[in-house]
Every structure is written in structure tokens, then in C-alpha cells.
């Protein structure tokens, strides 16, 4: 039954029945742990891989001895980096040793290898002042994969692929004649026996003795035209290097370099682990019948007698005894199973080797050799350390190749199994650390080439490590990765949930991953191995669906990059769920029967029912309680954080739940956040881990609290911890970040306690929206098609008001004609326009600005015309005339307005780092308060979204019997067809809870039942069906039927009408067609497309049509004259010839067609072409005003809106449907690319939107 639960500072009434057996892990540990691994081990591995660099003669050796990140010399703190557009990084110092083998001289030096970006505590990076996130990538794990296809006759043809981390691929395939072929590195195929011969089995008999009798192998031998090892080698060489003269030596060295050279071929730790797991004997021979006695080679004892069935445990012992092959009987046929001969070292070595830190299996022949040659413990350990690269090879070895062939031969007999590439046991995660490591490796290998070249050129006596090493390639590789990799994304900072989700995102796209076009349905689909690892619900709609996923709540990533999920261990004999928790990867879980978290247990953990519902692979079975292996730890284990925040998720249709998860991430932080009355209990954990809340570093007592700062006196040593709060800072998405203290002076705080609320949080819980009194009722058609009718109260009381901070910057640069100047002295500007500008030429903080107002006064020198000799003489006599300047001030763009909250000025004199050519940089921050308005998009948490259609006076809204009016009316028709019934349950429970004064926690899949909701409604004194009489606010009459009324949690989404509305009178035109550009960012016109033209044609609106095709679009002269006529109030003149028609004629003439244009009297019309200068001279001359309007305004990225809508962009498509009008934009030489970056950033960061 319902019970109170303490969440931070708030008590919630919880309906959860399952008590969580384990804590949820830190939600951003996937980022933090991976980066820490990189600093600890990843860098070390890369330096080990590249060591030593020798020159071509081998007498100079360069080695990287040690490295350290110099944390004391970090230039700027995180906050300063954001202000100064700097990168948060620490210098990487590497000790390098150079040895001259001729003279024996050794030089050691510490070399600076560039600044290395550091991860903040929140799991992000600050790159050039912008907060970025590195998204983890899901890729296919290196290893060996078996598959089959079915040919025309219905026969299974098996194939295999050996995929390394980097290096040549090996592919096996069978044709319908049962011949097995191999492809080496995607070349033409050869019979597989050629590869086996080249690896050392020359004659046919040797092959058959080793691999055993097999028809497919015999068929391959017959197809093979080589008979000895040498012929096999030459045949492979001819295929791989056609046209070169083949010799046995060159063939051997070619194969060695392709497969057995650690620099060229890398399996990686994961690849080696997967190889050993797949090719080991134990899984292949378990439950099979032995054809011969199996004898332990080291002791001589018989482990399995002929004809005996091999149990699972016995199979493990055989594997670890170092037995290479076992013959088994399948339907009275003898099949030989060959392993790659790797064993568990602890089963072979008589003493404890845990201090050697060997976690993988080791190669048995190499280990045997060490054990046979040495006897005492210390020497054996020394030798094992020395031979680690042979014991655990990073490349493949011959034994691996033989074992893969043997596996291929065994598959038709049911020995082994084929792989499913979409199974999470075969897909792994590359997180930040590994992605960085790969980038760093690329940089180092480029550097290695430079070092080798310099070794040969420079004088060997005076050479030092510093002279050899060029750090440019390394720094460039890292910079390129953070700046432009598809996986380095501009952080989605709309609200704390979107930050958290972004850090937990898993993408299958990116370098080395899939591409959107190539990804089929199978990759995108939900797989049974996703359970508890990847959320089946949260993924974007659109082309990226299923390729971008989210980590489940309890999931974590293991050292190999596989995702694990926790389960409770079940004591099978007693059918009792223990308290022991173990993490399982997807392929470990596949052998188990797993009970649900909601399965009823008694107080000692015994299953109540004799029969239990369990999951096994993709099936749901009912089995006796004594057969259950594992049990889920929590009901929310299967979903991601955003999805776990939807109450009554189990009552929603999956596609609506998907929209609900995605829309919560778009909720704008409101002025006064309010935690949901009906929550799911995960809100607190999500807010704390997202990194927007300041937490106490140590336990202590609060000694001082203000809006900007909190001080805590530490218990441990009596010192003071200071916490600065962020006030009105701009986020990446222009929302407002503001922190407010929630502790009082004298309060005792414990370590990690939340001290202040951030954006969208309330008492430390995520609060994305507001609890609203609403009813499901139609009202005069204003709720048609999901629209929402809202009360004026929501506007007046600032319920859905949000703050938005925009940043504008202005640079003063050096131009060819002299430096630009930031000044108050601007030509042709009235004093009135400068009333808020200070003497520096910069607007004051607190000023209210509207579009077109000056923010920063700036003048740029104008080019002087060539002077005549007389003018130069006069100039020389009478002194210099003042040089001409033009006004290039920064103004508020169209459609923007607000209050200046902050100004930042950076100059060279103050020692600020600026881009080359920039002398001064000014940034202005404008804050807007946006109230809710018609056209804004709102949504609930269940995918129920809509646009506001009308704001009704409070007195006209339907009202309750106690006189309270509703705040929102939703359409009841939006519920049944969408099947998101969760919203109705939420409304009922919220109605009861608000009356009882409760905040509720109803966890997903474990929440309040219908009966419990009814009980709550009755307890609160309402009808058990949750309906009530509602009165019409205009007439006071009751509506005919009872209406469902209650409290729903509603979010205001980031799609605000103010950002979308747009109009233009004149503006920029496309260069070739002279038609207006499209889109708000380009300040474009409205497109009047093909179908719209048909509509006018259908009604015979000839004049309108002519106007749209000419003066409102690309009749260059006509549009100027028309503008003039409208302003002066005259009649619109006759239109001329559209520019795009001239372009068409020119294109036909370019095809050597002599096209002439004739008028109705068959006279030729001359099509005058305008040069750019003539177009520029066409200026609208409006009588009585000195201002003239240029025809071709320059594109400024900041322009947004004008009131009058005149111009129309006409559709012109070339044959292949490519839109010309976006082709070229008019620009002037001083237009800086940087200004466009604001528009581009979002696209970079978010492939998915």
C-alpha cells in the first residue's frame, strides 16, 4: 500500500511494491570512468604500442618513458574558459629518451606535447568556450562471426568473417558444391586448403590428418591445384600482389606482415577475448559423445573414455588441460574439433599469479615452454612478464586460423552456433576514452613518420629528443576530433534532463560505424539482448530511429566495452532470491531463466508461487520456481532515465511513450519551477547526476547564504568551502541558467547534499513543467486537432513564463584601409538613437532595446577614390580631409528585443587572447521574458502534444462546482485513438493527491493500480470515477455530461512561436536567378511553389499570378519601381521580364540554340542584361526623404523580420530537382563567417533532429 519515502528535502507517497535491492549507479559514469581509464591506461597503451621509434639503420632509438598531465598549470578554470572562448585543457608532458647505439650515449628530456582537453566534473568538455559532449559509439566488436545462407536447393551454406580492430579481413564462404573458399583482405577467393598449406601443412595427407576426414574439406582439396606449402604460398602471393614476380620468401614475409605483425594487425583486447571465447573447446564439445579416449597431456590420465558423454564441467577441464583437439561422434560420424589452444593460466601454474594481473586466457604452447624450462616461482613469473606479448598476442596466430577453419567444418554437424550480429554480445561501446585513444594513436603514428625522417637528416651528434619530435600532428588530431568529429557534439543544454540524456546517448553512426543509408531494419530493431542495457523506447523519430539509443537506468559498461545489467542471484535449490547482485553481459545472460522484478516474494525472499513467469532469450515461459536462475533488480531496469520519468508508462502505447521521452528533453526551464505532483521517484537522482546542482563537497554547517554564494564550515578541519552560484547565465540553447539556494544559515549538511536549485529543478528534483488544473472537454472547436484552450490566468500569473538569453558579438578588426573603431561617434545617427550608449560606444547594462537599436557603435574606414593631381596638391596644402568612414554598428536583429543583462569587453591591451586581426571584441547579452502565447507548443509526459489555439478570459473558462475555473481544456478525442491512457490515470491520481496535499511517486511498471487510484479519490472526497459536473463560464449552465477533471503535468516546449514567425518586405536575393532567398535565417521570402501556381491558374487570377511571377520575385527593375509606387501611394507599374526567364534563354543559347524573344507584333525584344553595378545603382527614390533603399541588400546573418510581406520566392527547379535559389547568397567582403556559426552549431551538434 502507499507509504512515505524521503526524496532529498521532500516526502513523496510511494506506490512502489518492489524494494530496490541495489542503488542506481552514477548516471554519467559512462563518461567519467572512460576518461579516467584513458588518462590512467589508455595513453600508456598508445605510447607502448609506438615504442621504440628507430631510424632505418637502427642506431638511433627514441623511447617514450613516462607522461603526466600537468594539473597545476591549467591556464583557465571552467568558468573562465566559457567566458574567454578558451579550451579547458592541461599541458601534456612526456619524458622521452634518445639512445645512440653507436656511441652508447643516452639523452632524456621532458617534451611538451600540446594541451590536452580535460573533462569537467559534469562529464563534458569545454572546447573554444562551448560545452561539448562526446557521445559513445556502438560498433561491431572485433572477433570471428559465423553465418549461413540457404541456396536454391534449401541447403545451408556456412560462411565466416574474421574482423580485427584494424588489419586485413579473412572471409570464409561455401559454395553449393561444398567447396570452402577464403578471401584475404577482400581479394578474389581461393580454396581454403591453399591458406592451410601456406600456414604449414604442405601435403594433402597432412591436411587430412590434422583437420580430420570431412567431405567439404576433401572437395576443397580436389578443387585446389597446389600440392605443397611453397605452391600454396606462391598462389596467395599472386592473388594479393598481381603483376609482381612471386618468390617463396616474399610470400612468407607478405603473410607475416598481413597477419602476424602487431603494428599492422591488431585484434585488441576485446578481439582476443571474443576469439578465445568463440574458439575454445568447452562450448563446442559440451553434451557431445567422445569418439576416442581424451588424455591429459601433462599428467597422462584419461579424462573422458571413448563413448562417454562430455558434461559441461568436464568440457571446461579439457579446455584448460591444454588439449588441442578432441574427436567426437555426431550421428556415428567422426568430427574433429580443434581449439586455438588458449588456457586459463591459474589452472596450469601451481602457484598464485594474481599479482601479474593477467585477466585473459594465455597461449598454452608458449606457457608450456616456460614451465618446462624453468622451475622456481620468481623465474617463471619473470619469464611470463617478458613473454606477455606471446602469451596474449594482439594479432592472430596460426592456431587461431586453424581453429576458425575447424569451427567452419563443424557447423553442419551442429557443433558450435552461428552468430547474430545485432546481439549486444557482438556489439560494443567505444566511449570517450577509447575514441580519444584512437585519435591519439593516429596523431602519434603521423608523428612517428616525421621523427624517422628527421633522424636521417639531422646531425647525429648534436641531436636531442626535442629536435626530433614535432607535436603538430598530435595536437591537430586531438583538435580535429573535438572540433569536427561526428561524435563530438554541441551539448543539448535545454534542461537538466536533456544534458543527462545527451551524455548517456549511444550512437551507431560516426566514423567506423554505420551510415544512415546503409542501416537496414534489423540494426534499428529492438533486440531481446537490449533488456536492461538499452532503452527500447527512447530513440529519435525520423531517419535516425533505432541508430541512436539511450543507456538503460541500471546499465554499466565493462572493461571490454560490452554493456552489462545487474541481476539478483537465485538460490535454485530453495527457490529463493538472494540479496547478491551480479552484473551480466548479454551473452552470459543467454543461458539463464530470468524472473521479473515484480514476481511476488515472501519476506525471506522465497518465491510465493510454485510456477514463475520467466524470460529466456526472446521467449516468455512459465517454469517451476526451482528452475529460475536470476531475477531482475528493479522494474525500471529496462528503460532509460527520460522514459522512467513518465508515470503510468505501462498504460501508454510505445510510440506515444517515445514522443513523451523525447519531448521532456525539449521542455524550456520556467521562471518558477514546480515539481510534478505525480512523479515516478527518479526525478531526484536524475537532477543530482545531471550536474546542474551544486552539491556539498564535505559535511559541515552552513555559515552564510546569499543569492550568489553559500559558505559551509567543514566538520573535518573547521575550514570553509565556498560555493559560487551561477546567476542568469546563457546555456547552449539560449535558455537561462540560474541557481537559487535551498539551505538556510545554521543548517547541518552532509556530504553530496544539494545546496541550491538550478534551472528546471525544485528542491533538488527535476521540474520540467507545471501542475495544471485541466479537463477533457471540447470548447467551441478550439481543441480541434489537438489544439489547447488555455486560461488567461496562465499568462497573468506567469505560470508558463520563461527567460531566454541571446548573445550578440561585435569585433573591431584591422581592414586593408585601416582599423575599425568602436566609438560613440557614428555618422548620420540621431542623438536619440544613442541615448543608452556610453562614451565607449557600448550600450549600458539594464537598457531596454528593440529591433534595430544600436548595441555597439562601430565605424569602418571607407575606401578613398583615386585623387586627381590637383586634389592631391590641395590636400597637401590645406591638410588632410577627415577620412571617410561608414557605420557598421551592431544592431538588435529583427524580431528580437529585451533587456541588456551583461556586457563583456575583450581587448589586446588587457591581455585577452583574440583571433588574429581582431583588436577588440564586445559581447552583449539580451534577456527576454517570454509569456505563453498563441502558437506555442505544449505537451504532457505521455506524447500528448498540441499548440495553443486561444487564450480565453478566466471568466469564460468552464468552472467547477466550487467556482474554480479550469486552466486548460484538452480534447477528449485525443486519448482513445492514441492509446496513451497513462495521461487519464495521471489526471485522476493528481486530482486526489492535490486535495490530500501529497506528492506522489508511482514508479514505472510498479506504480499505482486502478483500485488504488479509486481509493485515493474516495479518500479525497471525490467520485470514484474521477468525473465531476462542469459549468459553462459564459452562461453558468452545467454541461450535459460529467467531465473528467484533474491535475496534469504540462511542459512548455522549446518550439516557441516568437522564434518561428517571420516576414519580409525586401531583402537578399539569390545571385543567379535574382529570386528572394528562403528561410528565416537568410531573411527570405515565402515560397510560392508549383502547386500554389496551379491554384491561381485554376481560378484564372491572371493579374495576381503575373505579379507573383514578376514584381514580387525576380523582375529586377519592376520590383524597385513597385516598392516606390507602394510607398508613394501610386498605381503599380507594368512588370518587366523576370530574371530567371533571361537565365533560361542564356542556358538555351549556351546549348547553341539561337533563341529569340518576340512580342505580340513579332518584333524581337532585346533582353537587357544588368551588371552588378547597375543593379546596385537602382535605388528606390522616395520623394521627400533622403534615404534611399538599396535593391540588393547584403545578407546579414542577424536579420530576422520585417512587418510587410511583399516579396515572394518562386520555385525554379532544374532537371534533377535541385533548388537553385539556395545556391548563392550575395555577400560583401567584410562578412565574417563567425556570424553564421550560431546558425550552424545546432545542426552539428544534433544529427538526430
Curated annotation (Swiss-Prot):
Entry keyword annotation includes Nucleotidyltransferase: yes
Biological processes per GO annotation: DNA-templated transcription
Gene3D superfamilies associated with the record: 2.40.50.100, 2.40.50.150, 3.90.1100.10, DNA-directed RNA polymerase, subunit 2, domain 6, RNA polymerase alpha subunit dimerisation domain, RNA polymerase Rpb2, domain 2
Single GO cellular component term: DNA-directed RNA polymerase complex
EC top class named in words: transferase
InterPro entries according to UniProt: DNA-dir_RNA_pol_bsu_external_1 (IPR019462), DNA-dir_RNA_pol_su2 (IPR015712), DNA-dir_RNAP_su2_dom (IPR007120), DNA-dir_RNAP_su2_hyb_sf (IPR037033), RNA_pol_bsu_bac (IPR010243), RNA_pol_bsu_CS (IPR007121), RNA_pol_bsu_protrusion (IPR007644), RNA_pol_Rpb2_2 (IPR007642)
Family (UniProt): Belongs to the RNA polymerase beta chain family.
NCBIfam families xrefs: PRK00405.1, rpoB
Name of this chain's protein: DNA-directed RNA polymerase subunit beta
Organism for this UniProt entry: Clostridium botulinum (strain Eklund 17B / Type B)
Classification of source organism: Bacteria, Bacillati, Bacillota, Clostridia, Eubacteriales
Gene, per the UniProt record: rpoB
Amino acid at each position: 500500500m502507499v507509504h512515505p519515502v524521503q526524496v532529498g528535502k521532500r516526502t513523496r507517497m510511494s506506490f512502489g511494491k518492489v524494494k530496490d535491492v541495489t542503488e542506481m549507479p552514477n548516471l554519467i559514469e559512462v563518461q567519467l570512468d572512460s576518461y579516467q581509464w584513458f588518462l590512467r591506461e589508455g595513453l600508456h597503451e598508445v605510447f607502448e604500442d609506438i615504442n621504440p621509434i628507430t631510424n632505418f639503420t637502427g642506431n638511433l632509438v627514441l623511447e617514450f618513458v613516462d607522461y603526466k598531465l600537468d594539473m597545476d598549470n591549467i591556464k583557465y578554470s571552467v568558468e573562465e574558459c566559457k567566458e574567454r572562448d578558451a579550451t579547458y585543457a592541461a599541458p601534456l608532458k612526456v619524458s622521452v629518451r634518445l639512445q645512440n647505439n653507436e656511441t652508447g650515449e643516452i639523452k632524456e628530456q621532458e617534451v611538451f606535447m600540446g594541451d590536452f582537453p580535460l573533462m569537467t566534473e559534469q562529464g563534458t568538455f569545454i572546447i573554444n568556450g562551448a560545452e561539448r559532449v562526446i557521445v559513445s559509439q556502438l560498433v561491431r566488436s572485433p572477433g570471428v562471426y559465423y553465418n549461413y545462407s540457404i541456396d536454391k536447393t534449401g541447403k545451408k551454406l556456412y560462411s565466416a568473417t574474421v574482423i580485427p580492430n584494424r588489419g586485413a579481413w579473412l572471409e570464409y564462404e561455401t559454395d553449393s558444391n561444398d567447396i570452402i573458399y577464403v578471401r584475404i583482405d577482400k581479394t578474389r577467393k581461393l580454396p581454403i586448403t591453399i591458406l592451410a598449406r601456406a600456414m604449414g601443412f604442405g601435403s594433402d595427407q597432412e591436411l587430412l590428418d590434422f583437420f580430420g576426414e570431412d567431405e567439404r574439406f576433401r572437395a576443397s582439396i580436389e578443387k585446389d591445384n597446389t600440392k605443397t606449402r611453397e605452391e600454396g604460398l606462391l598462389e596467395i602471393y599472386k592473388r594479393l600482389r598481381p603483376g609482381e614476380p612471386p618468390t617463396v620468401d616474399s610470400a612468407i614475409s607478405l603473410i607475416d606482415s598481413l597477419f602476424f605483425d602487431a603494428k599492422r594487425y591488431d585484434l585488441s583486447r576485446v578481439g582476443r577475448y571474443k576469439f578465445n571465447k568463440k574458439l575454445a573447446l568447452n562450448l563446442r564439445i559440451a553434451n557431445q559423445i567422445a569418439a576416442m579416449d581424451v588424455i591429459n597431456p601433462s599428467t597422462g590420465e584419461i579424462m573422458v573414455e571413448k563413448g562417454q558423454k562430455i558434461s559441461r564441467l568436464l568440457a571446461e577441464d579439457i579446455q584448460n588441460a591444454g588439449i588441442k583437439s578432441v574427436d567426437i561422434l555426431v550421428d556415428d560420424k567422426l568430427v574433429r574439433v580443434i581449439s586455438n589452444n588458449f588456457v586459463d593460466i591459474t589452472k596450469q601454474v601451481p602457484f598464485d599469479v594474481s599479482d601479474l594481473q593477467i585477466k585473459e586466457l594465455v597461449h598454452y604452447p608458449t606457457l608450456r615452454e616456460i614451465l618446462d624450462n624453468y622451475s622456481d616461482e620468481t623465474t617463471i613469473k619473470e619469464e611470463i612478464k617478458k613473454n606477455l606479448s606471446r602469451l596474449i598476442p594482439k594479432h592472430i596466430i596460426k592456431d587461431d586460423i586453424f581453429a576458425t577453419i575447424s569451427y567452419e567444418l563443424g557447423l553442419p554437424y551442429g557443433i558450435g552456433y552461428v552468430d547474430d550480429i545485432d546481439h549486444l554480445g557482438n556489439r560494443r561501446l567505444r566511449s570517450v576514452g577509447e575514441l580519444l585513444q584512437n585519435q591519439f594513436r593516429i596523431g602519434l603514428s603521423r608523428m612517428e613518420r616525421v621523427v624517422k625522417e628527421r633522424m636521417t637528416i639531422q646531425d647525429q651528434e648534436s641531436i636531442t629528443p626535442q629536435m626530433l619530435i614535432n607535436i603538430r600532428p598530435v595536437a591537430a588530431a586531438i583538435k580535429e576530433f573535438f572540433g569536427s568529429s561526428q561524435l563530438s557534439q554541441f551539448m543539448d543544454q535545454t534542461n537538466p534532463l536533456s544534458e543527462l540524456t545527451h551524455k548517456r546517448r549511444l550512437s551507431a553512426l560516426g566514423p567506423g560505424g554505420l551510415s544512415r543509408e546503409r542501416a537496414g531494419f534489423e540494426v534499428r530493431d529492438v533486440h531481446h539482448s537490449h533488456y536492461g542495457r538499452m532503452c527500447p523506447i527512447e530513440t529519435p523519430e525520423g531517419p535516425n530511429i533505432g541508430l541512436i539509443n539511450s543507456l538503460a537506468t541500471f546499465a554499466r559498461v565493462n572493461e571490454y566495452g560490452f554493456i552489462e545489467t545487474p541481476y539478483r542471484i537465485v538460490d535454485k535449490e530453495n527457490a529463493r532470491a538472494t540479496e547478491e547482485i551480479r552484473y551480466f553481459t548479454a551473452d552470459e545472460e543467454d543461458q539463464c531463466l530470468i524472473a521479473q522484478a515484480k514476481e511476488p516474494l515472501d519476506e525471506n525472499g522465497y518465491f510465493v508461487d510454485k510456477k514463475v513467469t520467466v524470460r529466456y532469450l526472446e521467449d516468455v515461459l512459465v517454469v517451476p520456481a526451482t528452475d529460475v536462475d536470476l531475477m531482475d533488480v528493479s522494474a525500471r531496469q529496462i528503460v532509460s532515465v527520460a522514459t522512467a520519468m513518465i508515470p503510468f508508462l505501462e498504460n501508454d502505447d510505445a510510440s506515444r511513450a517515445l514522443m513523451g521521452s523525447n519531448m521532456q528533453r525539449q521542455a524550456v526551464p520556467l521562471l518558477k519551477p514546480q515539481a510534478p505532483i505525480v512523479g515516478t521517484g527518479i526525478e531526484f537522482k536524475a537532477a543530482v547526476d545531471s550536474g546542474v546542482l551544486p552539491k556539498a563537497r564535505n559535511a559541515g554547517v552552513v555559515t552564510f547564504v546569499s543569492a550568489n554564494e553559500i559558505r559551509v564550515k567543514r566538520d573535518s578541519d573547521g575550514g570553509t568551502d565556498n560555493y559560487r552560484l551561477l546567476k542568469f547565465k546563457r546555456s547552449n540553447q539560449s535558455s537561462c541558467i540560474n541557481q537559487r539556494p535551498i539551505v538556510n544559515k545554521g543548517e547541518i549538511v552532509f556530504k553530496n547534499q544539494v545546496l541550491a536549485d538550478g534551472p528546471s529543478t525544485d528542491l533538488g528534483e527535476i521540474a520540467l513543467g507545471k501542475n495544471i488544473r485541466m479537463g477533457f472537454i471540447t470548447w467551441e472547436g478550439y481543441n480541434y486537432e489537438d489544439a489547447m484552450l488555455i486560461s488567461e490566468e496562465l499568462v497573468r500569473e506567469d505560470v508558463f513564463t520563461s527567460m531566454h538569453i541571446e548573445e550578440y558579438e561585435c569585433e573591431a578588426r584591422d581592414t586593408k584601409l585601416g582599423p575599425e573603431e568602436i566609438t560613440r561617434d557614428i555618422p548620420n545617427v540621431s542623438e536619440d538613437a544613442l541615448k543608452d550608449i556610453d562614451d565607449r560606444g557600448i550600450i549600458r547594462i539594464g537598457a531596454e532595446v528593440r529591433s534595430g537599436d544600436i548595441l555597439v557603435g562601430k565605424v569602418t574606414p571607407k575606401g578613398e577614390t583615386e585623387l586627381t593631381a590637383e586634389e592631391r596638391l590641395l590636400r597637401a596644402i590645406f591638410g588632410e580631409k577627415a577620412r571617410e568612414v561608414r557605420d557598421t554598428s551592431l544592431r538588435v536583429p529583427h524580431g528580437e528585443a529585451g533587456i541588456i543583462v551583461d556586457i563583456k569587453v575583450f581587448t589586446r591591451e588587457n591581455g585577452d587572447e583574440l583571433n588574429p586581426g581582431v583588436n577588440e571584441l564586445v559581447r552583449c547579452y539580451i534577456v527576454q521574458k517570454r509569456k505563453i502565447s498563441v502558437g506555442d507548443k505544449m505537451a504532457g509526459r505521455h506524447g500528448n502534444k498540441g499548440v495553443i489555439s486561444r487564450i480565453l478570459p478566466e471568466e469564460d473558462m468552464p468552472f467547477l462546482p466550487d467556482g474554480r475555473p479550469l486552466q486548460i481544456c484538452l480534447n477528449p478525442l485525443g486519448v482513445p485513438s492514441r492509446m496513451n491512457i497513462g495521461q487519464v490515470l495521471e489526471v485522476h491520481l493528481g486530482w486526489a493527491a492535490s486535495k490530500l496535499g501529497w506528492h506522489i511517486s508511482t514508479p514505472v511498471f510498479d506504480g499505482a493500480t486502478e483500485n488504488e487510484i479509486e481509493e485515493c479519490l474516495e479518500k479525497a472526497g471525490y467520485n470514484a470515477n474521477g468525473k465531476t459536473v462542469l459549468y459553462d463560464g459564459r452562461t453558468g449552465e452545467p454541461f450535459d455530461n460529467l467531465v473528467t477533471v484533474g491535475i496534469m503535468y504540462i511542459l512548455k516546449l522549446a518550439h516557441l512561436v516568437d522564434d518561428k514567425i517571420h516576414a519580409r518586405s525586401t531583402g537578399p536575393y539569390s545571385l543567379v536567378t535574382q529570386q528572394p532567398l528562403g528561410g528565416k535565417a537568410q531573411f527570405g521570402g515565402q515560397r510560392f511553389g508549383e502547386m500554389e501556381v496551379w491554384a491561381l491558374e485554376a481560378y484564372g487570377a491572371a493579374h495576381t499570378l503575373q505579379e507573383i511571377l514578376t514584381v514580387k520575385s525576380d523582375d529586377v527593375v519592376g520590383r524597385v519601381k513597385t516598392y516606390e509606387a507602394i510607398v508613394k501611394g501610386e498605381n503599380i507599374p507594368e512588370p518587366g521580364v523576370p530574371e530567371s526567364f533571361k537565365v533560361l534563354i542564356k542556358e538555351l543559347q549556351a546549348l547553341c540554340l539561337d533563341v529569340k524573344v518576340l512580342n505580340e507584333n513579332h518584333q524581337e525584344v532585346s533582353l537587357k542584361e544588368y551588371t552588378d553595378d547597375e543593379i546596385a545603382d537602382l535605388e528606390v527614390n522616395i520623394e521627400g526623404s533622403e534615404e534611399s533603399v538599396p535593391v540588393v541588400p547584403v545578407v546579414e546573418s542577424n536579420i530576422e523580420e520585417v512587418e510587410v510581406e511583399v516579396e515572394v520566392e518562386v520555385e525554379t527547379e532544374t532537371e534533377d530537382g535541385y533548388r537553385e535559389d539556395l545556391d548563392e547568397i550575395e555577400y560583401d567582403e567584410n562578412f565574417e563567417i563567425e556570424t553564421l556559426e550560431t546558425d550552424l552549431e545546432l545542426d552539428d551538434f544534433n544529427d538526430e533532429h
